[in-house]
């Protein structure tokens, strides 16, 4: 695999039972790319992320992540799922949530000072250092998303995978989140799933269109025709940048 390629997918197919989800998928992602995965509901976007993480195994074809099988590279990938399996009412501080991201990097026993230093740095990077001791349940939706991104950063990844990180956020908060992801992309490969088609050309470099098969475009080349072909109908391309 070329040195600047961090993910390579070749001739991949996957089905849940007899229901095909992905067929004959081949593409690659370069280091420090900013990638948005788009497509209709049920098109295979989240399944593709799970295959990249090694949580699912392809029926045919291969995936290499950082020149390794996905399950071997998982420690080098930070992941924020679409729905965090956290009870927002559980009495846990923001820093405790982020500390969970150190579990796979830490031997059995109490967390070390180095772990807590890494957590503090991750919270600072996402702009949440001042709220580190605040209860997770007391945070706003956007603040919780930042904490969950910090949790993904706490494992010191080379690739950041995010499933719908701006879902259900107000437009201004979405803009702030997108600016954060842009800054993270200065040192990390960032791959996210988004239903916000207007987000695509505004922030990202590469668009991976998923609807059973996969087509890869530069962000500048995404047009109404390509999106219509992907979704099967017209989709409004709305920009969310606001002035305040």
Task: Give residue spans per PLM region.
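Conserved ABC ATPase "signature" region
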Residues: 99, 113-131
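Helix-to-loop junction immediately C-terminal to a conserved catalytic motif
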Residues: 53
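Conserved ABC transporter NBD signature motif
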Residues: 61-75
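Helical segment within the ABC ATPase nucleotide-binding domain
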Residues: 174-186
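Conserved beta-strand-loop-alpha-helix hinge in the C-terminal portion
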Residues: 210-237
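Conserved ABC ATPase signature
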Residues: 135-139, 143
